[in-house]
Amino acid sequence: MTTEPLFFKPVFKERIWGGTALADFGYTIPSQRTGECWAFAAHQNGQSVVQNGMYKGFTLSELWEHHRHLFGQLEGDRFPLLTKILDADQDLSVQVHPNDEYANIHENGELGKTECWYIIDCQKDAEIIYGHNATTKEELTTMIERGEWDELLRRVKVKPGDFFYVPSGTVHAIGKGILALETQQNSDTTYRLYDYDRKDAEGKLRELHLKKSIEVIEVPSIPERHTVHHEQIEDLLTTTLIECAYFSVGKWNLSGSASLKQQKPFLLISVIEGEGRMISGEYVYPFKKGDHMLLPYGLGEFKLEGYAECIVSHL
């Protein structure tokens, strides 16, 4: 049992639509087209690494495989979540993700992908694509084949602080000028439906996955309803943004100090603004914007001090 938070070093991904905004978190980014920060990642395409304590140098996958007590002895062959920060300097492709059953059959045992977005920042008039207007699979197929994207896709204006739940089967895309934190199932399976006819670094059109997309898109497209809950704990305002079968995600606004107890199998904390410190036992752990902490099972009582905004997630 450990009574210390585990700080993780993220993995960065260059993307055709990425930019430089992730540098504002204090990160050293690999290029001017850095699109993704994989903050908590235990996937074959990216592994975040512990930066402190007795588990320093371990990947998240290694902790899950060999130190399951840190996660309350949860079952499963892989860590269940993946947390990212996305910098959309340009529009992301219009895409959809499969559910677990479809992905297991068609993607060699991969998980499906239900996700959610918290809008950290965005340009004025920024928008996302969130759902579609087709009423039947036949209409959906026809509109895709004809390239009737303006008629098919639903566009939604966004502002900082907005939150969107994106279940598998939902047509979606993050638009230009948006910085978002994404919590998702631990999957990297994406079916690209439309990519604005963009070309990659070699001058080739990026691959589309029309057949699979049409098979997994939910018709009709009905936005998921979710209820937001608030709780004040001393100087900490906690907001529950979503609770679903795959994860629970919330926001913490710290404006002073608060005493808490870690009672989940694990708790993931991403600091998106401000700074402070966590006190656990006799030890003090400073944190700042851009830090990502995993609070393991059994950590017990701890105290937060400072002024910060965090996105937190757990099962």
UniProtKB/Swiss-Prot annotation:
The keyword Protein biosynthesis does not apply. The active site is at R192. Signal peptide: none annotated. Binds 1 zinc ion per subunit. Its EC number is 5.3.1.8. Its cofactor is Zn(2+). The keyword Oxidoreductase does not apply. Disruption phenotype: Cells lacking this gene are unable to grow in minimal medium with mannose as the sole carbon source. They show impaired growth in rich medium, and impairment increases in the presence of greater than 1.4 mM mannose. It catalyses: D-mannose 6-phosphate = D-fructose 6-phosphate. It comes from the Bacteria. Zn(2+) binds at H97, E115, H172. InterPro entries: Carb_Metab_Reg_Kinase/Isom, Man6P_Isoase-1, Man6P_isomerase_Firm_short, MPI_cupin_dom, PMI_typeI_cat, RmlC-like_jellyroll, RmlC_Cupin_sf. Keywords: Isomerase, Metal-binding, Zinc. One of its GO terms (biological process) is carbohydrate metabolic process. It is an enzyme of class 5 (isomerase). Gene3D superfamilies: Jelly Rolls. GO terms for molecular function: mannose-6-phosphate isomerase activity; zinc ion binding. Belongs to the mannose-6-phosphate isomerase type 1 family. NCBIfam families: manA. This is Mannose-6-phosphate isomerase ManA. It comes from Bacillus subtilis (strain 168).
